[in-house]
Amino acid sequence: MASTISAYKEKMKELSVLSLICSCFYTQPHPNTVYQYGDMEVKQLDKRASGQSFEVILKSPSDLSPESPMLSSPPKKKDTSLEELQKRLEAAEERRKTQEAQVLKQLAERREHEREVLHKALEENNNFSRQAEEKLNYKMELSKEIREAHLAALRERLREKELHAAEVRRNKEQREEMSG
């Protein structure tokens, strides 16, 4: 079953390449052309401006004859040498160290940025507090001066009233002495 699936995948890759090559050489397809590929049968349905359409028919595993050759597995990779493996390991280790250094650098930059932001926020807070305190002190001084000026004005009026009352009393006493 697994070999059938892998064969199907390979044939689908080959089919698209084959179709491209055939369409280059034969611009007019043969009507009802059927292609046989091992355990697959491919029928060309129609050709459109947008592309071609095909019908792919897979034969069941029971229909496959034992005489049909098994499709070869993909070529094996060549054995890698110890030196090559060592180079790969060293390169991987170097990439890991570089990535780790980059992460540490980013963390350090982020911490430095956080410190700068915190320092700036504290500085702005201190400036705001100092300005608010200066403004409050100014208002208190102004209020104190206004209050003292108001009290001085009240004292002055009171003194003037007392002087006027004393003058009125004197005038009254003088009239009483003259009349009496």
UniProtKB/Swiss-Prot annotation:
Residues linked to a lipid group, S-palmitoyl cysteine type: 22, 24
GO cellular component: cytoplasm; cytosol; Golgi apparatus; growth cone; neuron projection
Coiled coil: 75-179
In-chain residues carrying the UniProt-annotated modification Phosphoserine: 50, 60, 65, 68, 72-73, 81
A single GO molecular function term of this UniProt record: protein domain specific binding
Low complexity bias: start-end ranges: 60-74
GO biological process terms on file: blastocyst hatching; cytoplasmic microtubule organization; microtubule depolymerization; negative regulation of neuron projection development; negative regulation of Rac protein signal transduction; nervous system development; neuron projection development; regulation of cytoskeleton organization
Record keywords, A-Z: Cell projection, Coiled coil, Cytoplasm, Golgi apparatus, Lipoprotein, Palmitate, Phosphoprotein
Annotated spans, Disordered: 59-82
Recorded family membership: Belongs to the stathmin family.
Subunit structure: Interacts with STAT3. Interacts with CLU (secreted form); this interaction may act as an important modulator during neuronal differentiation.
Protein's UniProt name: Stathmin-3
